[in-house]
Amino acid sequence: SIIKKAYPAAEKMTDLLDGALMNAGPIIHPPLIMMNAGPLEHFDVWDIHNEGTQPSIRSVTDSLDKERISLREALGYREPHFPLKNHYDDTLEEWMYGNSSHEKLTNSGDWREKIDLHNHRYMREDTALGLAFLCSLGRWKNHLMPISEGLLAIASGITGEILYESGRSLESLGLADLTVDEMKNMLEKGIAV
């Protein structure tokens, strides 16, 4: 294809949902901001990618990513899934951002910032839109997503909003009543206007 010629490393996606389930933001950022809420609110600036990325937080991130991959598989999507753990370990298969990307990120100092837990994009985009969407897909497919649901509940407690209701979900998009076959058909052919 013309895209493969222009971008040889590009991976072919089955459909839009396949691509959406590759978004790393809802996997990386919700654990980092929820589990670093104290330091983020206490210190003037805090680097969630450096001091904020500790073994227990990485463990939650890996568990969250396993849910994403398991959901992809339950929806019939095949590899590559680009597991996030590869971003943190250059001895594993190269991740979508390339080897050494995490080291470059933490060494840059660019991420030492003030994060407002109510309005920052990690809460508004990656959590209220991205993580809520993953939770809604899990509910729709009757696929357990306890880490996703737990982080979304904590985020709701922080913001004082029920982010599942105010965020992006199949319900808010008017797609929750579709069957799996209807969803696949819509993703392949679009919506008749």
Residue ranges and their predicted role:
Residues 1-85:
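Internal alpha-helical scaffold of NAD(P)-dependent oxidoreductase catalytic cores
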